[in-house]
From Swiss-Prot:
Organism: Rhodococcus jostii (strain RHA1)
Enzyme's top EC category: lyase
UniProt key word Magnesium: yes
Protein name: 4-hydroxy-2-oxovalerate aldolase
KW Cytoplasm (keyword) present: no
Catalysis performed (reactions): (S)-4-hydroxy-2-oxopentanoate = acetaldehyde + pyruvate
UniProt family annotation: Belongs to the HpcH/HpaI aldolase family.
Length: 258
């Protein structure tokens, strides 16, 4: 059996636009509903969503049945043990939060690579199909997509250095935490924050790496794409469910009491 090729990593390297969707429900059943929707990629959120290793595994399994949809996973932190566990589950693309410096980015890359280029521990796991991919240890490093999140003022000051780290495939701008870091908590739409986001997208692209971002606002998604974003998540399952169920209930409440 041949180790799988990471189509998402290839698309980022080629600068091909990838439209995605955020999974925060922590549920494989709803993840499969989204996997068939037509998105290029889905992000399984292990930082803010109620996840554990088994819930992430279940979502990787159901999304894996949809060949045109790639599963990426956000780890809860840059902890090397956590990164190893998520990679062993079979995640090929990781999003690592709160990376502020080039040294931190380089440490993330090392955690994702086997020796001698890194420190990832070797063990029989789903990623190698329990040894059925005979060359997995030799091929895995080239197929792991490493994306780090720049989401503080400090990260923006180090953006080029972070992007230029060998092994970093993309830099994702975390708009909510960035807004808080810049003094506008809860207001990523503030003009100063938006200017910083657009500037960051262009700087990452100029450094030769793929910039990414998340927004459930369609006009902003289009703006980010126009300013160089390569991979954009255009919605969140929890946000969409809350918004649409509230709107539906409100419409029928008006009918009931009219």
């Amino acid at each position: 059996m041949q180790s799988p090729i990471n189509s998402f990593k290839k698309a980022l390297a080629e600068g091909r636009t990838q439209i995605g969707f955020w999974l925060a429900l922590g549920d494989a059943y709803s993840a499969e509903v989204c996997a068939g929707a037509g998105f290029d990629w889905l992000l399984i959120d292990g930082e803010h969503a109620p996840q554990d290793l088994r819930s992430v595994l279940a979502q990787l399994q159901v999304i894996g049945a949809y060949r045109d949809c790639h599963a990426a996973v956000r780890v809860p932190s840059a902890d090397t043990t956590v990164i190893k566990q998520y990679l062993d589950l079979g995640a090929q693309s990781l999003l690592v939060p709160m990376v502020d410096t080039a040294d931190e980015a380089a440490a993330v890359v090392r955690a994702c690579r086997y020796p001698p280029g890194g420190i990832r521990g070797v063990g029989g796991a789903r990623a190698s199909r329990w040894g059925r991919y005979p060359r997995y240890l030799h091929e895995a490093d080239e197929q792991v997509c490493v994306v780090v999140q720049a989401e503080t003022a400090l990260a923006l000051s180090n953006l080029e250095a972070i992007a230029e780290v060998d092994g970093i495939d993309g830099v994702f701008i975390g708009t909510a935490d960035l807004a808080a870091s810049l003094g506008f908590p809860g207001n990523p739409a503030h003009p100063e924050v938006q200017d910083a986001i657009l500037d960051a997208l262009q700087r990452v692209r100029a450094a030769g790496k793929a910039p990414g971002v998340l927004t459930p606002v369609e006009d902003l998604a289009q703006k980010y794409l126009a300013h160089g974003a390569v991979f954009v998540a255009v919605g969140i399952d929890t946000h969409l469910l809350a918004k649409q169920t509230s709107a539906l209930a409100a419409r029928f409440a008006q009918v009931a009491y009219s």
